[in-house]
Each structure stands twice: as C-alpha cells, then as structure tokens.
Amino acid sequence: MPEFNIVEHTCDICVVGGGLAGCMAAIRAGELNDRVILVDKSNPERSGCTATGTDHIWAYFPDIQKTEGVSLDDLVEDHVRSLAKGLINKEIIHYIAATAYDRILDLEGYGMKMRYADSTLPGNFRLQYQLHSCRNTLHFDGRDVKRVLTEQVRKRGVKVADRVMINDLLVHEGQVAGAVGYGTRDGKLHVFHAKAVIMAAGRPNRLYKTYSGLVFNTRMPPALTGDGKAAMFRAGVELINMEFVSIPGRWSSKNLVRGGGLPGGSYQPCGIGVNGLDEVIRPRNHEMGQWQGPATPFGTDKTFMGELKAGRGPIYADMSWGSEQDQTYMHWAIANEGSGSCFHHLNQQYGIDFRKHKIELWPLEPEHSAAAAGGPIIDGKCQTSLPGLFAAGDEAGGIPQSVVPGALTMGHLAGESAVAFAKQMTHVPPGGNFDTLLEFSSQVKTRMHGDAWQEAQSFIQNVMSDYNIAYRSGTMAQRGIDSLTYLKQNMRLSAANPHEMTHCLEMRNLIECGEIIFRGTIERRESRFRIFTRLDYPERDDANFFC
C-alpha cells in the first residue's frame, strides 16, 4: 500500500461544505468559538448552489405580511400543505420561516443591497409571488453573495481549508470525532479531529444522464456528488426520503442549463411560453407591479410535452413581451441568478437579445433536491442521529423547498448547536480509523492502465436513468442494485493525478447514493405525488408511509 502524506488538523467545530449553509454555520460558530475550520471541496467564494449568485429568497416579512392578513403560522401551514404535502419537519420549517428575515438583515449588514427606492412596500423590498400564496419572495442583488459570506467567515477567524473533498466521518465510541478528506490539488489526505461536525455538502448531482449529453452541463453544481450523504451513511447515520426525486417537470434553456425561476422568479414579468407555431401555451402570470397570485410553473410535462407530442414543437421562452421597465427588471434579475450571466455574455458575443430572440427550452434531468429533500433526519437543533454531527441546508432530510432561507437559517442554527455541543466536551475525541478510504485510494493510485472514472460515471448514469425514473418498480430497483453492486465489485479505477483521483472518489459516493435510493424505492411500497411513483404500487399509502 503506497504512503499518503497525511495532514492532521484539530479544531472544536469542523464545517463540511462552503455553500450558503456551510458559510452561515461557520460564521455563527466563529462568533461563538475561536477553533472553527471550514472545509470546502472547491473555494467557498464561488462554490455551492449559489456560487454564481441568487436573486431571490423567501421569508416572512412582518410589516408586509401582517397588513395583508397573513400570519407566520399561515405561511408555515401554506408551506407544509402546498409544497411539502405534509411530509416535513414542522419544527425546522417554523424556525426557517420565523428567522429568515433576520438572516436577510444579516446579509444587508454584511453590505448586500436588499432595499430599492422603486418599491412602494414597507422597507422598500422588491417582493414577488413565487412558492407561497402570499407575496414573500425578495428579489435582491445576490450575484456576489458567496464572496460576501466568505469574507465574513474569514473576519471571524475561521480557518478555511479549500480544495479538500471530505469522504468519510471519524467516529469514536458512538460519537462523531471528525472527518477525513482528500486534497483535490495537493493529493494529501487531510484528517480533521473535532468535537462536533456540521455537514453541509449539498445534494447528489450527476446521478442521471443529462439531455445535452454533457456530464457537467447540469442545472446545479456538478461538483456536488452526495459526498456528505455517502459519508454519513457509511458512519451509520439515519437517512430519510432519499428515494424522492424532484424534476422532471421543469424545463430550462436547451444546451445552456441554468438554475433559477423560469419564469416565476428571474424571468418574470416578461416571459411567456410559445410553441413552434408561435402560439402562446403558457401566458404571463402577472404584469409588472400587479401581482395577482402565486407564479405558475413555467414548464410542465402536461403542457410542453403535449405540444411536442402533437407536432407543435419546439418550445420557446419568449421574453419580448412587456414594457422597457419589465425588460430592465428581468435583465437585472437574471444577472444575479445562477448562471444567468451567461445570457449577457451571449448578448455581447453573439448578439442574443431577449427583446428579439426566443430561447428554446428542453426538460431538465431528474434531481434529488428541493421538493425531494433526502438526507439525514435532524431534530430541532439540526442534530442528526449521530451525536455531535449536525446537518444544514440541502444536506438535511425532510425539509422540502427550504432552499435559500433554509440554507441560511439552518446553517446559523447548526453553528449555534454545534458550539453548544462542543462546550460540553473537555477534549477532542481520538480519531476513528479510515482504513476503507485509505485502501480504496491506494488501489486507485497504484493501479496502472485501469478504468477511467468517466466509464464508471457513464455506467452509473445509465443505471439510474434506466431503472429509477420512468419505469420504477421494486424489481427494477433490485436490478439497479445488482448493477451498481457489479460495478462496485468489478471496476478497477485508476488515477494519474489528484484531479482524476477526486473524480474516482466521487464515483464511490455516487454508487453509495444510488444504492441508497434504490433500497429506499424498494421499501416505499406506494406512489406519492410527483416526487415518487412506483408502477407496481400506483396508490398513495398514508397508513404506512406518511409521517
């Protein structure tokens, strides 16, 4: 077995993941404790789902919602019933709704612009309808939110270990003792000994084939490969709802996938949907400044797929509608949301103009995010079933559609909770072993002329796309498990450098997540709305599967 250079780190709080949740956890923990380390697979300045910005966040705005007759409890109940369909951690979603406004004020205090002179609402906030039945989604200048948060992380004395991919947790006598990761640039193994760990590594992307055929052309960051969920599972942490799938049903720009509302967020108020005959098939759902109700989802299989099957494709987003004020607002919003700035590059480079050119749309690949919300079950303090281990944001299970406010608020709460836990301990526990990770990495490192990680990636995506979406059933899921087991037992990955080693470690985690999803599918013998369907169990079974 070849020797790896091992770098030891010791801290009280180890935060895994530098997205919104991880940064907020590090900020809050850093305010209460001077021995905090933030570990990020990339660079926290531009990592996570808001790496290139976000233009919206929902919250309860007391001065606005109260005048409209909406209480905090009303908003929570709306979220529970309409978005989560009852399957949600009510204590956490109440906390999110109650404190999201405070986190917005935090962002404003960090220097982000949240108020606008053209708004007539109390506080000069630009609010839209989006997810809920009340107007409570704030549009703001969020392009550089990650840079701002990373600056705040460093100001609090938090040590940042970037370019380190956490692979496994250290466990000692039934309690978390830290985490171990691989340096994606230096090729070293980094061992973090800690009293408490906050897991905020995000969702498992890259499980399914993309419509463009490009592995990394995904709506959300392709670097998110379920590393945290796989590590927690290997450590014996209880996971829930991993079998749930969000999307298909949403559409995005063809061959240039981007996140963000389409058009319920960034694209309103200009966007409409038209077919190949230029017939309007998805009208505008409100005029600028004249919101009538919650935004209509722009792309649904029922409408858009129906047009394609009827021979009336392609499908386009036509943003030429609306006044100059509408256009200005839309361009501002898109520039702050996800990879929307790519459109401005296309405008400058190729003359693409929303006022003149329609944007072709195509379905998005399936995801395990948003409405799906699979991950570790957490209590009201964000603690998982493993003492000392906390989870926040997309990492946590059972909080559908918590999105940006969920990341900010749960990160803040997890930071406080982890510090409180660490205070009870007199010393950092001795580290557990990571022999399995060391053995896997050593084999990949020394193997000559082995399998490329791309081959394993293609295998995984074929298996997940074939057996877990359109034709999902118990027998199909078992076939999926058998296929992933064959891959795990027979693949002989090799890596010539740290970059390739990182991708090989990602394959290890994707296989783990895929198998968890299939096993969850077998156990959930029912169908539940759009997030989970089984052809052999087409009916909902609340008696056995509703909590």
Give the role of each language-model region:
Residues 13-38:
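N-terminal Rossmann-like FAD-binding beta1-loop-alpha1 element of flavoenzymes
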Residues 199-257, 404-417:
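Glycine-rich loop(s) and the adjacent beta-strand/alpha-helix scaffold that form part
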Residues 231, 237-359, 408, 417:
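An anion/pyrophosphate-binding glycine-rich loop and adjacent beta-alpha core
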Residues 42-68, 249, 257-260:
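Conserved N-terminal glycine-rich FAD pyrophosphate-binding loop of Rossmann-like flavoproteins
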Residues 8-11, 185-196, 385:
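Core beta-strand elements of the Rossmann-like FAD/NAD(P) dinucleotide-binding domain
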Residues 1-10, 34, 43-45, 52, ...:
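Glycine- and aromatic-enriched mobile tails/lids
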Residues 59-95:
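Glycine-rich active-site loop/strand segments that organize a redox cofactor
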Residues 46, 103-193, 203-211, 243, ...:
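Conserved redox-cofactor binding core of oxidoreductases
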